[in-house]
Structure formats: structure tokens, C-alpha cells
Amino acid sequence: MSPRSADPGVRMALLETAARIIATEGLGKLTLRRLAHEVGTSTMAIYTHFGGMTELRREIRREGFARLGARQAAVDTTGDPIADLCVLGWAYYRNAIENPNLYQAMFMDGPIDEADAGVGLDTFGQLVTTVQRGIGSGRLDPADPVGLATQLWALIHGLVTLELARLLSPDQVRACLDDGARNLITAFGDDPRAFGRSLTRATDRSSRPAIRAKPVSAVDIAGSSSYRG
């Protein structure tokens, strides 16, 4: 089977199955034979599609960031950059929850090497650009746009990771996303009342995950003995 005749369905099955093995069992459990067996193909198919396991693992990361980038790119740019920041955060959350194995595998396979140094920069750049629009609108402190974007990314990534590990429930995470964004964005200069109005506008847009529970406090989290999904 030549690269030209390679089946894209098999390629995606290899990527998603490899991501599941890495995410649920660890990188050490991913082998050529096991992957080929679970997908129902030959080990040669892995070489046909990826050239080997090293490139397959790189493609998992690239595919994960490609899906994240597409999800974020679908977020409309409006006249309210703070609302846009909130919707970008929810888009990140939804992408991770809908692609849990791929998302976890993206960050479990060690540091990004020089060959993939640019992977993920586009998705982070979308966040930085939106923060810069907030600065341009006069609502955010102009001192450190990259710093705010980094802290927002860390907030969302950390909460998503806790949910995927079943240490926090979806409702707890969704409430903390809003509270954490409020705390960070107002700390970087936004007026709390203006943020509240932006959050309301963002809530009216379709990307927001529903929150059914009241916001969770540190006492609630400490008192929860286990996740109840």
C-alpha cells in the first residue's frame, strides 16, 4: 500500500487508538503490534501512514492542536473582546472534553522538540490577540498581554485536567471557569461590573457549556470525598 493509496480512515483510527492507549495506560503501553491489532490492520500500515512510531506520536499532538485551533477559529470576533475571551475559554473546554484521549495524549508525551516547536503557538496566539483587543478597548492593563493569556490558558488547562482525572465534577469545573476568569481579568484591569455584562453576553452565545450547580467554594471541594460523575 503506497502513501497515495493510504486509507485516511485507517490513519485516523491509528491516531485515535494510539491516543487512547497513551491517555489511559501510558506511553509505555503503546507498541506497533498492539496498535495494529486493535485497529485491525498491519504494522506496515503504521509505517505507510506515519513512517514509524516517533512520527505517529508527533501527529497525535499535531492533530490535537489542529482540532483545538479549528474550535477556537470558529469563535466569532465581536465588539466585546472580554466576552470573546470567555467564549474562547469555553471552546477550549469543549474541545478537551469531547476529545479526552487526544487532549491528554497531547500533553503526556514529553516536551515538544525542535521539529514541533511551532505546534500550539497558533492556538495560544488566538488567546493573546483577543487579550490585546481587550487592551485596545481600554478595559485591560496594557502591561502584560502574554502574561494574562498564559494565566488564562493555565486556568483552563488545569481545570480540564482535574475533570478528566475525575477529581472535580463537570459542574464544579464550569463554575470555576467563570469565577477564575472573573478573578484574572478584573485583576488585569477590567471593571467587575463590565466583566459581568460581558459574561452575560458570552452566555447568550452557543459555545457556553451549561452550568447546573451553584458556584463551588473551597469548602465544598475540600468536603467532597470523591467525584460523582
Task: List each language-model region with its residue ranges.
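Helix-turn-helix
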Residues: A13, T17, A23-E55, E59
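Amphipathic alpha-helical packing segments from all-alpha helical-bundle domains
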Residues: N95, I112-S137, V146-Q151, A175-T186
